[in-house]
Each structure stands twice: as C-alpha cells, then as structure tokens.
Design a protein with these regions (language model features):
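C-terminal peripheral helix-coil segments that are non-catalytic and often amphipathic
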Residues: 1-7, 107, 111, 154, ...
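Basic, helix-initiating cap at the start of DNA-binding domains
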Residues: 1-35, 39-48, 65
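Hydrophobic alpha-helical connector segments
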Residues: 69, 83-122, 179-182
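Amphipathic alpha-helical segments used for helix-helix packing
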Residues: 110-111, 115-140, 191
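Short hydrophobic/aromatic patch on the recognition helix
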Residues: 50-60
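Amphipathic alpha-helical packing segments from all-alpha helical-bundle domains
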Residues: 79, 83, 123, 137-166, ...
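Alpha-helical DNA-contacting segments of helix-turn-helix folds
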Residues: 67-74
Length: 231
C-alpha cells in the first residue's frame, strides 16, 4: 500500500517571514510610486512596515534590492494580466467595441495601457530612474524580473505587429518605438499633473492620455488600409 506524500507545510516562522516580505514589498511599491527611488529611504520603509531597520536588512541587503523586489512583483502582476488578456478571443482577429469593429490586437494594447494608467492613478505603479547604474545592475541580475519583462515585451510586441499588419497602427513606426511609447505611460508625468490639478476625474484623465497616446500611433484617416498594405 503506497502512502501519498503530503506537501510540506511551511513553519509558522516561515509564514511570518513571507508575510513580512510581502508587507515590505507593498510598502516599497507605494513609496516608489509616490516619491520615486531617489527620494525613498530605507528608514521610511521600515517605519511604515513597523519593523526595525536592522530587521529589514535581514530580508533585503540594500535599497536597490528593495526596489528590485517591488519591480519583480510589478512585472509578474503585469504578465499575469497580459496572459489573461492574451487568452481572451485568441481565435478572433476582430472585436466589437462600442458598436464598432476593431482589431483584437489593438483592443488588447488599449486594455493593457488603460490597466497601467489605472494602477498609476491608484499609486500602485512603481517608477525607477533610468540613470541609476547600481539599480539597473540589480534588475538585470534578477532572473524573475528579466523573464517577466521579456514575456511582457513579447506579448505586447506581437499585438503591435498584428495591429500594424491590419492597418490600425502606423506601420511606418518601428514596433520597438510603439512598445516604448506604451511602456512610457507607466511613468508619464502628465498623469500626475492632471491629477494634481483636481480638474478631472481619474477616468477622464485615463481617456485623455489614451487619446493623446493612441491617436499619435494610429494610421491617419486619409490613409486607407488598402494603401497601407500596398506600400
């Protein structure tokens, strides 16, 4: 009679350490979103989580490691959302949005950008300086982060190329330019400026940023899809 092996249960101490790391990462995520990497301090993170600075260093050795952990969490969250989006209507090339037929690929690009802006307005989108070499090195050395980033880029890239083939996004733009344009929405200062003005609701801000972003990427109305395919 064979005995079934039960998965080993985590000890109470291991569960507590994991819960603390999640709390630390959530705090870092929020502080990076609100203040950015340069202004955020390790003392702030420790105080917000309610632990001593020395205890925090038992989990993460540096400020760069803290930021890296938050970015891993963010990229994995983005990957999960995009994978779910990719699974929807996989066999279809057209979707009906507000009574009009549009490209499924374009619809997914817009949905992913809208999701990014919603997180940003909710203070859940960490932003990092591009010029910090030690931070960049930490991210480049993180396998979970790089794997997630590659998968996210592959998914978005495939939708961009498809939308260009279908004549919805300007094919004169290199796909990498479109990809970076969409990535830039995660750190777009226009979103913060509009929110600080208190003149518009979050949904209005999202619609305005979506319009300025995608209207610049779309094929012009006077350019027919037929002309696009013949060039």
């Amino acid at each position: 009679m064979s005995a079934t092996l039960e998965p080993l249960k985590k000890s109470f101490k291991a569960q507590m350490l994991e819960a603390r790391e999640l709390a630390i990462t959530a705090s870092v995520n929020r502080l990076l979103s609100e203040k950015g990497f340069d202004a955020m301090t390790v003392d702030e993170v420790a105080a917000e989580v309610g632990i001593a600075k020395a205890s925090l260093y038992k989990h993460f050795n540096s400020k760069e490691e803290l930021a890296c952990a938050a970015m891993v969490q963010a990229i994995q969250k983005a990957q999960a959302y995009l994978e779910d989006l990719n699974a929807q209507s996989a066999a279809n090339t057209e979707a009906e949005v507000e009574g009009e037929l549009t490209s499924v690929a374009l619809h997914k690009l817009k949905a992913s950008t809208r999701w990014t802006l919603q997180l940003k307005l909710a203070g859940q989108m960490p932003t990092l300086p591009s010029h910090n070499s030690s931070l960049r090195a930490s991210l480049m050395a993180s396998r979970p982060y790089m794997d997630g980033l590659m998968r996210v880029s592959d998914l978005l890239g495939a939708w961009i190329v498809q939308a260009q083939k279908e004549g919805f996004i300007n094919a004169a733009l290199p796909p990498i330019t479109v990809l970076y344009t969409l990535y830039a929405r995660a750190c777009d200062p226009v979103v913060e400026f509009l929110k600080m003005s208190e003149l518009h609701s979050n949904e209005e801000i999202i619609e305005m940023v979506m319009t300025t972003c995608f209207d610049g990427l779309m094929v012009r109305k006077n350019e027919s899809k037929l002309d696009h395919h013949t060039h």
